[in-house]
Amino acid sequence: MSALKKCVAVAALLGLTGTAHSALFHRGGGMVYDSTLDITWLADWNLVGHQMQWATAKDWASNLVHGGYDDWRLPAVVQPDESCSHNSPQPGLLDFKYYGFTCMASEMSHLFYADLGGKTGAAITEQAGDAPQELANLALFCNMQYGVYWYGT
C-alpha cells in the first residue's frame, strides 16, 4: 500500500476527519485543510521519501502538482513574532527578540502548537496529555520524520 493510501486509510479507519470545532479537515487526495490559516497541508510529511536541502525543497514545492493544485509552497514564517515566549534580547547574546517557543504567527508553528498539541522540546508524536481534538488532528497526517522541516522564508 502506498504511503498516500496509508495516510488516507488511517484517517478513515479512525474516523478522525475533524469536527465543527476543528481548524483542520481531511480534504481527500492526501491533503488537510486548515480553516484558521486558510491553507492546505500535504497529509504525508515525507512525500518525497528523503531529506532535501533548503533550495531543493523550495524548488520542489514550487513545482509540485498535487490534488489538482499547482500553487504549493513551503510554510511561511512571520518575523518579528510577538507571540513567542522569549520576546526580548538577552544581554551579551545576539538579539533573539521575537524568537523562542510557542510562537503562533507562523504557519508551521501554529500547526504544531495550536492544532496538534505540540509541546516545547517534545516530538509531535509524543501525545501524552493531548486533547481529543489534537489527537484527531494528528491522525490526519502521516509519515512524520524526526528532524528539520523547512520554512519558505
Show where each model-derived region lies:
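Short, compositionally biased
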Residues: S2-Y69, N87-S88, A114, K119, ...
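An exposed tryptophan-centered "aromatic clamp" motif
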Residues: K58-Y69, V77-T153
